[in-house]
């Protein structure tokens, strides 16, 4: 189940004259940030042009994984998975959270060596990650035996149902006194004496001391209107879910060309690991040089489409006045069509790797746009030149699992608390200060 612009509006709090913090974007990062801010006694308003979890936050795979993470992300996601576990008991709603493990199957010695190289990092954080032999994979993964050389496995990794989890957090935020308004685009920010003093929404002005921009695929466009350059592109990812299915694995697994996650409804969420698509547009050329290393490393897994950038087609404007209708109001929810080729690739992958699932109907298929930075790790930082404006974006397909941890990080930044983690890797300035590009593990 996903949310789109036909989903009934569920959160329609009146706009206040003043709050301490306005959060732009009601995805998992924005809602989690607001949740932790409110826990600290801060008054907070979350505005979203569309719906809570309307874009990637209801469309992702539902994985909550430590395994395979970037070294700088890992301590944050360790905090995050523990937060997901505590939230599951605290929210008074079933969000489908469970720890059933993440498994990356390897079909040859080269993949085994790649996975083994990550064990050192796992050991530094006392994770329960280990390598499985071929026989151990067959014991856990009830597919065709004998097709795997081994696997990397982290039993403590988990999953949750995205379409349940983020709205549940939003409802909890409201119970604590936080405000949420769907269908309310923030057009711009206001400044006074050199720092943030408020926001202009389509419904009026709201005064505040700080703003957190957690706009996902839209963050770069919002900043462009402020003459701030954020190198961020989008990738279309297609996902499907099956009818109830035999239990071939209780957790999440990458089986070479296909990924599976057991769902709470006894089906599987399915994705193809090689069918992400980037629609080449003006921003692609604008940021081409910064993305060259990522393109070189991911050419096997990323398809380029030359029929025009999707966001470019939807949002030809890059600048607007505060009293003008913005691109955010023209496109309430970014709701791309799923790729027919990607769905076919999933079918082929299942037939090859998990034939027990191959003939099951896909009861729903959807797509989402993933916000990707040049080094495939997020930005979590204050925006240079705009004191009081904070940015949390570019989670590059990793946002759902790390959501609560990233929300806590952003709340600490806004409140001026010493960060619990080293955030150097996530500086906004790394794209402009000559820092060497170091790629993260990928989408």
Please describe what each predicted stretch is.
Residues 1-21, 39, 436-440:
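Extreme N-terminal leader/targeting segments of oxidoreductases
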Residues 21-45:
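N-terminal Rossmann-like FAD-binding beta1-loop-alpha1 element of flavoenzymes
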Residues 32, 189-316, 329-340, 345-353, ...:
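Flavin-dependent oxidoreductases
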Residues 39-58:
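Glycine-rich FAD pyrophosphate-binding loop
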Residues 62-140, 257-260, 267, 274-280, ...:
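Dinucleotide-binding Rossmann-like beta1-alpha1 core, especially the glycine-rich loop
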Residues 75-78, 104-114, 153-171, 181, ...:
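Short beta-strand to alpha-helix junction loop
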Residues 152-209:
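Helical element adjacent to the flavin cofactor pocket in flavoenzyme catalytic cores
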Residues 315-436:
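C-terminal catalytic lobe of FAD-dependent flavoproteins
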